[in-house]
Amino acid sequence: MSVKNIAVDGCTLEFQNGGGPNTAITIEPNQTSTKVKAEGKAVYKTLKFTISGYTAPATEKPNWVSGSGSGNGEITVTAEHVTIEGNKVILEGDVSESITISGQEYSGSSTVASTFTEVVKVTDAGQSKVKGA
């Protein structure tokens, strides 16, 4: 069991495979505790997000239309011993299940629907003093 930083409002989410410069990961509102804070920032009870402007890696999807991907997902909780308001906390390093990104690929002179599978990870908890396991 390893002890890790607990994710708070302002944490950083990153893709493990693609993304691109104009890709946005937008955390859905109203998922933080109204009672529990770490370093003055609200702790996440759940962490659902939407993805827009996604570009698949050229090595795997060379015909992907840049910025055409979108999808949504949720970080999977790994904490076993720390809960807030009945929910296990989200830790730095936690990842989502595989997310299906829907987008477009070039096919000749037109585009066709395509998908790519991605994983999102909490790479920075947004604070470094409060830890959980």
Question: Which residues fall in each region the model found?
Answer:
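Intrinsically disordered, low-complexity proline/glycine-rich segments
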Residues: 1-133
